[in-house]
């Protein structure tokens, strides 16, 4: 084995361990998979869902709990879709899988004008079909392949174009409460997944339902974030971390926090806000200062000088 091959193998092992560690941590943090679960892994044929299936299968062998994996792909009847690729790949893995056939292509093409983005309607139709199929096969969790970068991009998409502070949660109870959606790749970086897919040589199937048309808004957000990351390394991770530490009282949503019902309560001991240093710098106000009286007002120039000297 040459030195280059040895180094390449070492780098791949590090990458695989990092991805498995990130997926394992996300699963543990959000209790995504429990003992006895039947996890329906949605496989699109893209790099992310392939990686998700591969990593979950690896974790399944080492996990202290027992859970089943069922791979599901939705054949949307796009012209030229290579129907043989996924069945051949999944047969080689020896796992249970289903190909769900639904002609959403015709529906999307009949509703969306030529040249317009089809992603929104396509995803809604696909989601409805997959939710129903999950119930049919008794799946207790639906695993989707969205990663950390997808989540942050969605946050800014909703802010910039929808006026909502909303992203993609790592774990979600569907509106009708009949399905739980999990995103095991929530802590994974897209660049890692791209390299992993390249090294594993997954048989990638491009989405050509809309002629490989890019979602221009998402691409603009992606470029913006990449620019930030280049200038300020670690920026995307910091933004993602902020989604895990939300202070509802510091925002402005009256449904999320009861601003209207705020009242004063001075029965408890005053909280130390760390202003002892300010108390030491500023001399106490004269006793004559009360109400609208200005007799005890301090000279602002002297106060500023005192602060500067301190």
UniProtKB/Swiss-Prot annotation:
Catalyzes the ATP-dependent 2-thiolation of cytidine in position 32 of tRNA, to form 2-thiocytidine (s(2)C32). The sulfur atoms are provided by the cysteine/cysteine desulfurase (IscS) system. The keyword Metal-binding applies. A motif (PP-loop motif) lies at residues 44-49. This is tRNA-cytidine(32) 2-sulfurtransferase. Signal peptide: none annotated. GO terms for cellular component: cytoplasm. [4Fe-4S] cluster binds at residues 119, 122, 210. It is an enzyme of class 2 (transferase). InterPro entries: Rossmann-like_a/b/a_fold (IPR014729), TilS/TtcA_N (IPR011063), tRNA_Cyd_32_2_STrfase (IPR012089), tRNA_thiolation_TtcA_Ctu1 (IPR035107). Gene3D superfamilies: HUPs. It catalyses: cytidine(32) in tRNA + S-sulfanyl-L-cysteinyl-[cysteine desulfurase] + AH2 + ATP = 2-thiocytidine(32) in tRNA + L-cysteinyl-[cysteine desulfurase] + A + AMP + diphosphate + H(+). The keyword Nucleotide-binding applies. SUPFAM superfamilies: Adenine nucleotide alpha hydrolases-like. Pathway: tRNA modification. Pfam families: ATP_bind_3. Belongs to the TtcA family. One of its GO terms (biological process) is tRNA thio-modification. CDD domains: TtcA-like. Binds 1 [4Fe-4S] cluster per subunit. The cluster is chelated by three Cys residues, the fourth Fe has a free coordination site that may bind a sulfur atom transferred from the persulfide of IscS. One of its GO terms (molecular function) is magnesium ion binding. Its cofactor is Mg(2+); [4Fe-4S] cluster.
């Amino acid at each position: 084995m040459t030195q280059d091959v040895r180094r390449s193998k070492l780098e791949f092992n590090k990458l695989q361990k990092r991805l498995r560690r990130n997926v394992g941590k996300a699963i543990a943090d959000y209790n995504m998979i429990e003992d006895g679960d039947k996890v329906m892994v949605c496989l699109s044929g893209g790099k992310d869902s392939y990686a998700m299936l591969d990593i979950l299968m690896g974790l399944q062998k080492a996990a202290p709990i027992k859970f089943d994996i069922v791979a599901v792909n939705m054949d949307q009847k796009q012209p030229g879709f290579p129907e043989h690729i996924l069945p051949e790949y999944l047969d080689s893995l020896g796992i249970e899988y289903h190909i769900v056939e639904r002609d959403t292509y015709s529906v999307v093409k009949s509703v969306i004008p030529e040249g317009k983005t089809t992603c929104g309607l396509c995803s809604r139709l696909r989601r409805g079909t997959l939710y129903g199929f999950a119930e049919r096969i008794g799946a207790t969790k639906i695993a989707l392949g969205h990663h950390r970068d997808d989540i942050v991009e969605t946050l800014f998409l909703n802010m910039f174009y929808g006026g909502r502070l909303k992203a993609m949660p790592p774990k979600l109870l569907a509106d009708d409460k009949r399905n739980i959606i999990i995103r095991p790749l929530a802590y994974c970086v897209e660049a890692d997944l791209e390299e992993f897919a390249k090294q594993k040589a997954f048989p990638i199937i491009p989405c050509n339902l809309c002629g490989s048309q890019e979602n221009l808004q998402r691409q603009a957000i992606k470029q913006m974030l990449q620019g930030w990351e280049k200038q300020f390394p670690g920026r995307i991770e910091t933004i993602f971390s902020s989604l895990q530490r939300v202070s509802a009282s510091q925002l402005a949503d009256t449904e999320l926090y009861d601003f209207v019902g705020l009242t004063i309560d001075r029965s408890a001991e005053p909280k130390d806000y760390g202003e002892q240093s300010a108390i030491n710098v500023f001399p106490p106000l004269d006793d004559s200062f009360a109400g609208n009286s200005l007799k005890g007002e301090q000279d602002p120039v002297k106060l500023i000088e005192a602060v500067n000297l301190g």
